[in-house]
């Protein structure tokens, strides 16, 4: 029995996430295999997917698989342990960031849209390797998705929507109850929430998650889109936190193409979309190595690199 317990201890994944940029050691990368047929407009979860469904240019599975494999190769190049979901036939499993997130050594399951609940079951082989006492299910009324949650040292930054019309927005994914639940779960942290701009119809005016309009990068730098925030003072708080000279402001179109949704392997290494010329040039000016990948097809679903990764361990 002692040997069994010892083996269990060394086999468990020891979670550790305290920020967005420390050296990545283990991650769950989504999959585009067996992604299913083109959804109907009624089945679209966001305005950008709906836009490409209407235009008849919704991304093809083979193109998305190729894009994700390019990311997998870069992660392997940097010796990152990569887990993948078990493939469910005809089911979208690209955006693993939505289904769960890690803060410190806690694995927190998201309360997501009911149609997407199978996605968490598809990573059960990963969850089984986590100490069960570290797995948290938030109360049912606390709606949350990982794209809205960013640990940053003593802070946990959370995107939300505080409007009384929350239920009218399919694009509102994290509510005030979830913000409160996180503060209870991490009383030693400062949980700071940001009221995000939502639109069911115009993707250029929709911050689906916090990482669609903001992300820390490098050493004390950040990418931000002003109009993603409904409250000017909350946007200013973030700019002041990093310092104006350390913030890269992206335009409405750059937000639409998901420029703030790159992914950090380390403080000095990021994976970014190859068409983000202005951003990638700025990142290199900061001394950051930019590993460029094609990801424009996946971005048609209003998600990019951060959205399709679920980090488990950073140094």
Predicted segment positions?
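The feature marks the mature, well-folded catalytic cores of soluble enzymes
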Residues: 7-315
């Amino acid at each position: 029995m002692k040997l069994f317990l010892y083996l269990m201890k060394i086999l468990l994944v020891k979670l550790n996430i305290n920020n967005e940029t420390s050296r990545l050691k283990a991650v769950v990368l989504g999959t585009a295999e067996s992604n299913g047929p083109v959804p109907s407009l009624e089945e679209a979860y966001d305005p950008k997917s709906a836009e490409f469904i209407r235009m008849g240019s919704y991304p093809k599975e083979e193109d998305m698989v190729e894009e994700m494999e390019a990311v997998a190769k870069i992660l392997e190049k940097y010796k990152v342990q990569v887990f993948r979901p078990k493939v469910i036939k005809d089911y979208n499993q690209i955006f693993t960031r939505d289904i769960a997130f890690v803060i410190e050594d806690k694995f927190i399951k998201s309360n997501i849209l009911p149609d997407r609940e199978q996605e968490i079951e598809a990573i059960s082989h990963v969850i089984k390797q986590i100490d069960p006492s570290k797995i948290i299910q938030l109360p049912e009324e606390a709606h949350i998705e990982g794209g809205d949650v960013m640990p940053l040292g003593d802070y946990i930054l959370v995107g939300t929507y505080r409007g009384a019309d929350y239920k009218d927005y399919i694009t509102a994914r994290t509510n005030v109850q979830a913000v409160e639940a996180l503060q209870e779960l991490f009383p030693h942290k400062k949980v700071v929430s940001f009221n995000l701009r939502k639109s069911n119809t115009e993707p250029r005016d929709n911050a689906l998650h916090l990482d669609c309009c903001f992300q820390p990068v490098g050493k004390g730098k950040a990418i931000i889109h002003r109009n993603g925030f409904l409250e000017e003072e909350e946007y200013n708080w973030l700019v002041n936190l990093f310092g104006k000279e350390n913030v890269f402001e992206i335009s409405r179109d750059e937000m639409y193409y998901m420029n703030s949704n790159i992914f950090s392997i380390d403080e000095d290494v990021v994976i970014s979309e190859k068409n983000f010329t202005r951003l990638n040039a700025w990142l290199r000016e900061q001394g950051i190595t930019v590993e460029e990948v094609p990801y424009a097809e996946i971005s048609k679903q209003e998600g990019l690199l951060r959205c399709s990764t679920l980090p488990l361990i950073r140094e």
